Amino acid sequence: MSRLDYPAFDCDNHYYEALDAFTRHVPKAMQSRCVQWAEIDGRKRLLVGGRINRFIPNPTFNPVSKPGALDAYFRGKVAGGDMRAMFGELDPISPAYRDRDARIALMAQQGLEGAMFFPTLAVGMEESLRFDVPALCAAFSAFNRWLLEDWGFAYQGKIFAAPYFTLADPEWAAKEADWAIANGVKVIVMRTSPAINPAGGTR
């Protein structure tokens, strides 16, 4: 691989959410309708809207696949198959996947000047909560406040984490945008699909 003679800026970087990403700031009255954790058959399970959610096979992300595990697959160089097998040997989660200072140190090793950071688990939660728009908005209000605390919207001018927006409730989205702008947001993330309506359909 050729090397750049200047630091790169990565527009598609990701983190793995902390276990309390959706729970730290959610109102107590909404907890059972949003995102919770439960111990079931000795395993930590994610409950979304009171149901086991399987969007991510192991939403604790510990252990997790090695970086680039699916590179050959996404480049069309190998056929698909059993996804668990394709992930290969798993590693304990790295501090750099959840701690912004550890990530900045890693970025320096990688030659990155800065990066936009996007969710992993959170991108599947809008679909999971589409039939309960108040819970959907409460969940992402909580998530975005966790994101600001743990990663920051423009941390040290290097980490630009994107809060998640849904248009299921446009009034909520407008207020959330005002809050995000007041906290220095530079980039947001939204689902690439029609907006959900309060009945769970689309606008």
Residue ranges and their predicted role:
Residues M1-R203:
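Helix-coil boundary/capping segments in enzymes
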